[in-house]
Amino acid sequence: MVKKNNLKNLGFAFPVGSPHVSRTMMLAELGILLEFVADPQAPQKDYIHAVVQDNCLGKRTAKNRLISKRYLVELYSLDPNLALFRALLFFWQRDQGGHPLLALLCVYARDTLLRASAKYILPLTEGSLVTRESMELFLDN
């Protein structure tokens, strides 16, 4: 069995909470940010600066910029020192049509709630109704 510490070193995360409680995968924001910070060697601080100082996402308030920064870091790490983010950048530049799937794979590795709910969601057909109660019941068991 692979230890959590080894996975964390690659960029996987095991948080108690989840950005998915109040946010989506922020796919559009990720795309804007990765276009704004075009250097694949850029350190994490450059991504954070782009969101918070440069307001590349066009947020109306400083608080919204900080919230967006926090969720983007939780979802994607934005840290080229981690293999997961480096892989995201590598494939992002090579497959524009694959952006949604690449983002999903990265978030799946970093978001506990998404991983926990995948077994419930994946067998459903597109357009199926998922109620809060049914999801809570699944997650509680």
What are the functions of these language-model segments?
Residues 2-109, 130:
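Eukaryotic partner-binding/assembly regions in large regulatory complexes
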Residues 34, 118-122, 136:
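Amphipathic alpha-helical segments within well-ordered protein domains
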Residues 38, 122, 140:
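Hydrophobic/aromatic-lined pockets within catalytic cores
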Residues 108-121:
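A eukaryotic nuclear recognition-module signature that targets compact all-alpha binding cores
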Residues 123-127:
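Short helix-capping/hinge SLiMs at alpha-helix to coil transitions
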Residues 131-141:
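DNA-recognition alpha helix
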